[in-house]
């Protein structure tokens, strides 16, 4: 057995040597790789920790120290105008510092439940809160929830800038931990509650309680009041309980639910507090809130603080901010003078709102918040939501159709009886129809039907997209066809700020800049934050230029003439809105009374939107009279005259071509060589769309000029005491013969196709004057002559001699007649030339009359609204004397008749009727 065992053992060893096991080899290899990987990771971890520690140390090495004066005594912030001049200081004088012992538990708990539920558990930073914020941001988007603790907020607002950098965040974490080590929780909470921003006039819980509830003893604050205040820091403007009670109440109820969740209040307390409306929980009245202020730029400053709050993550309560704004104090002073003075025609109860922008960059230079408006009151420049009237037409109708359909300024639109798509008729204030008119004329005269047709041509969706690109923020589902003429429904409306921003893009080659009040912020550590919005292209340059050129016409000869400024290139549009039938009866609105009156206009330098309407007044007046509707245009004109030096112009881009077209041609045709000057129009076309066909309308007139009545001759028959009148005419015509005897009036004696007329029973010694007019399909031709009948003689020889002389004289006169006609034709100085000239002058004067609207009738009372919820329509701001349009006209000319005292003088003229 032993030998056998040895033999097997020997064989096993031999096999082992000759065939190594592959499995054992792999196991040894895996073990080595694992050890190497583990060792490598360990090395990297150590290096990472060391590197992180070094990096952390470097980042916090220059972190500011915990300066107790900055932590407990907030510094004020300074606001500067566009030139860097200080205009206001905010913060320090708006605080009432209270100690933690003066702050009741209900207030502390309301803020802790809302801002930092684990405040008493963490050591400056809260990993649980940070994790929750990360999840919320992942689910709902970046910024959905913040991860900062109350401690971090104190550090950030007292010691650091708001730059979104890793270094700043690391320093914030480090300083928060240090703050927790050096100060108690109550001390940190006291710092926080005394620096929170509630409004430009209220920093800290002490001032806020007084500002919104009239409470100076914080122990008297109720649960619902504490919850309302705790809900405000997230968005102080939106959750202001005086200005926005509904939003404030929704936010307060969220805070109450958080307080209940954290066990700070019971279910019964929660239910009781939730039932109390914000307006019933002791909020001060609007009048109490509208306190006087020593700063004359307070309305502008409020918008500055509001913009910082809404458009950045900068806390306005942060210490030592330097806020650089867009304010032009000179313009603001002038606007205040206009709004509160009596130079523009304001009447008792009238209100107004104005926004003045820089056309090129959207910077707000001045605002008219209202007439004698108290600080903190309603801001008519930024908060108004009024129907825009006809000022919407460039934005929602003509701008989109030029951009997408490339309509020219000459595009012919039929202003005839028309209805909305739902069958409801649409009308203009004058209840008239002008027939085919150009887009330029339609916009300048503010006609409604062409505007609706332009809107329909481009389509609602495209039109709304265009308008929203200019900042209007319309919802497509809400927009009806009535919007095309300014009949907004529901809660839709526009402010002067919105309209100024939209119109400025037309004056800026199609580039839109969102209106803004703040340029930049400098923090107490010297870092800066640029808040200038990015520019965006809202339309093609050809759209911007063509709208601008048409709006220049609206100011020169249309409804906006009162807004003209000498020496300044102005483009702009009027707009008025009216009342529905029920409101007219309810408020006893006078005929022509308007709800709103607008003027929105711009120059190469400035854009201004002006709204006027009736505010609260003791008389209860609701509407603007025709005279009061002029105020908006006067404000614009006087403001621009003061701030604009007239430099700059609206330059035609290469994408636009100019063409002289024949008035009334449709489609457009170029004016021909014979087109009368008063039938020529210079219009603009998108490059590649201009007409190439030359009109031939007036060519036939030149060719048929020779078809004149000529050779008018008179022969006397002594025996029959008659005169025979004859003439030449090449073609078919009807001839009207008129006669005058001895200077009397003309009377028609014959009207036929015959080319002669016999006048019997003539009286010797009398002078007969004749006028013959040929009337044909090609026009009219008139000639005239006169003849003196010889007196009777007793001497037969003398009679014979006289007869011979008369016959000779007749022959000479016949020759003279022919010479006279020829010379008149050669000289080209016929009576007809004079007649045409005078008629053209008269036509031009009539054209001027027809395109020069009266400012007394600048409203468009169109009671047609496609929206059942709103019957308010735009007025077309037209003129009852506007008459017919710019695209049709009559060429029929009246004749002058030249008669003389010669025995016989012929003259001829021609008049063509098309």
Curated annotation (Swiss-Prot):
Residues 829-840 have a biased composition (Acidic residues). The active site is at residues 115, 390. Pathway: Cell wall biogenesis; peptidoglycan biosynthesis. It is a single-pass type II membrane protein. It is found in: Cell membrane; Forespore inner membrane. Residues 1-29, 773-914 are annotated as: Disordered. Residues 1-37 are cytoplasmic. Residues 848-892, 900-914 have a biased composition (Low complexity). This is Penicillin-binding protein 1A/1B. It comes from Bacillus subtilis (strain 168).
